[in-house]
């Protein structure tokens, strides 16, 4: 059974059709990179999958269960939408850390808020919070940021902030990680430290969808590559097929201008 199945996802903004019927599926532990020119619909697709945008048509299923169906016109409550979003961990090109909180608090804030819904919260609050903080500290250790737990975002480099953002997303134990151009706001020197973290997640069989302009990285880390153009999937296949034997003229043109 596929961990994620996306069927006929369509999205328009005004008169502009941004997504024109997107279909794909992925297996648990698989890494899919989505490539394409700016404006091809990559980010909008990612946002529709994770319910940051509401698709006009189509369905999204996780573990065989349809969690979004655009044909059902009743609006989802904020609580329902949040429950759907918990299947996914989000990492954006802008780090979106809370400037008023230190690194540890940025990572533990959402898990602690969710913990309040537990039936044993009042009785075991201290123990629950200790477990959450222990998880956060382990994530910081894996990210090479143990010494930054009490630092604030303004005291970190861009690469360090993005690594904290990744740790924050992982702290909620998502089924699937969604990365939207996670290195585009970074200097070249800082890009590698973030890509190294993402590669380490792939090595642990974390299921991931990565929108990226880092072609060499996509070639290295992906099980499957999707090339989007004009709101559709123009071509998809293994990294060897996409980068080594592109079939469409549009993909050939795109790759000729990309750094491989």
PLM-predicted stretches and their roles:
Residues 177-180:
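Catalytic Walker B motif of ABC-type/P-loop ATPase nucleotide-binding domains
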Residues 188-190:
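Helix N-cap at the start of a conserved alpha-helix in ABC-type nucleotide-binding domains
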């Amino acid at each position: 059974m596929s961990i994620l199945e996306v069927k006929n996802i369509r999205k328009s903004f005004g008169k502009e059709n941004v997504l024109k019927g997107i279909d794909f599926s992925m297996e648990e532990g698989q890494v899919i990179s989505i490539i394409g020119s700016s404006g091809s619909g990559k980010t909008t697709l990612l946002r529709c999958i994770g319910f940051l945008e509401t698709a006009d048509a189509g369905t999204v299923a996780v573990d065989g269960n349809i969690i979004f169906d655009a044909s059902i016109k009743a609006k989802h409550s904020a609580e329902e939408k949040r429950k759907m979003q918990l299947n996914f961990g989000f990492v954006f090109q802008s780090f979106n850390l809370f400037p008023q909180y230190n690194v540890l608090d940025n990572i533990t804030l959402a898990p602690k808020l969710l913990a309040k819904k537990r039936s044993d919260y009042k009785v075991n609050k201290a123990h629950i919070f200790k477990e959450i903080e222990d998880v956060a500290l382990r994530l910081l250790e894996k990210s090479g940021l143990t010494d930054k737990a009490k630092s604030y975002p303004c005291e970190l480099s861009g690469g360090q902030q993005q690594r904290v953002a990744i740790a924050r997303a992982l702290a909620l134990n998502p089924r699937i990680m969604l990365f939207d151009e996670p290195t585009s706001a970074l200097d070249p020197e800082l890009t590698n430290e973030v890509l190294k973290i993402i590669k380490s997640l792939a090595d642990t069989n974390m299921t991931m969808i990565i929108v990226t302009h880092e072609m060499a990285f996509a070639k290295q880390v992906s099980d499957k590559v999707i090339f989007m153009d004009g709101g559709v999937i123009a071509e998809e296949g293994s990294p060897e097929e996409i980068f080594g034997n592109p079939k469409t003229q549009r993909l050939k043109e795109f790759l000729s201008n990309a750094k491989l």
